[in-house]
Amino acid sequence: MKLLKSLAVSAMALLFAATAQAKEVTLLMDWFPQGNQSVFWQAMLDNDEHDLKINVKAGGPGINTAAQTAAGSVEFGLQGSDSVMAANAKGAGLVAVFANLDHVPYTLVFHPDQGIKTIQDLDGRRFAVKMGVTYWKWVKAEYGVSADEFPLKGDLALFAREKEMFQQGYSLFLPARLAAQGVATDQITLESLGYRPYSVLFTTQKMIDENPELVQEVVDRLRAAFAKSLNNPDPTADLILSKSKKVTRDIHMGAIELMKADFLPKDYSKLGCMKSERWEELSAQLKQVDMVPGDFDASSSYNLSFLGNCE
């Protein structure tokens, strides 16, 4: 009888230990599945090799990634560093721990036969834009331009018809999608104008305070997955393209090459790295357009300690 009790206690202890080790986190993306998210989908594909299970959840219209992460509905979210600071100005308590792109690939796309050479040449034109987007507030203030803004609905046919309008998008995808439909484009990137927020994975300060080991494990997993997905992009391409039909395989693979050329470090050991100076630069730009208060402390919105090896 004592032996049976002992075995039962041992079994319960083993079950408890197994349950305690069954760690799981959810990463909420900034948009539908697409190539700039490859690192996160690769991490999910690698789950069988690790105790920590990383689930990736697609974003999209009407999904507020920052708000859901701040509320604890998910453990991590993906957005621009400008969105993180704007949310923190309202008390969200978010902290970026990993950059998946050196800058969000915001771009302004227009028809090439309109005589547009500079940002000022877009003044007064119709503009398909995500209403209230932070970068456009800064562009208007910095360059003194305005536009006839209307909500972006992703209607490429409208852009093809209206020769004088311009449209926001990601430089990794929008020009290539239009080219595939026979529509020639030119573009002005926000990075070329001096606005360059990181694309970042963030969590909450509460998570960092209560479970820093878990945050570190996620960051380490992402670094390994990132290099893996860049060296062999086919598995993540298969997964992403099965979930979203907005781009072809050629466009997806082209975006990966653009990322490697212009958005990622050549040394893959530096993947995920960020610099304090860039956060301070962006904070000053956000203060310029009253997106954060004048006394806002940018350092409260990021934590470099999980990255290491970034010098």
Protein language model features and the residues they cover:
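Bacterial N-terminal signal peptides that target proteins for export
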Residues: 1-8
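Short, glycine-/small- and polar/acidic-enriched structural segments
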Residues: 24-152, 156, 160-161, 165-169
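A bilobed periplasmic-binding-protein/Venus flytrap-type ligand-binding module shared by bacterial periplasmic
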Residues: 42-43, 106-116, 198-214, 267
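N-terminal secretory/targeting leader peptides
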Residues: 51-54, 183, 245, 271
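Pocket-lining segment of extracytoplasmic ligand-binding domains
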Residues: 82, 148, 152-246
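Secondary-structure end/capping motifs
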Residues: 210-291
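Conserved C-terminal helix/tail region of periplasmic/extracytoplasmic solute-binding proteins
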Residues: 280-311
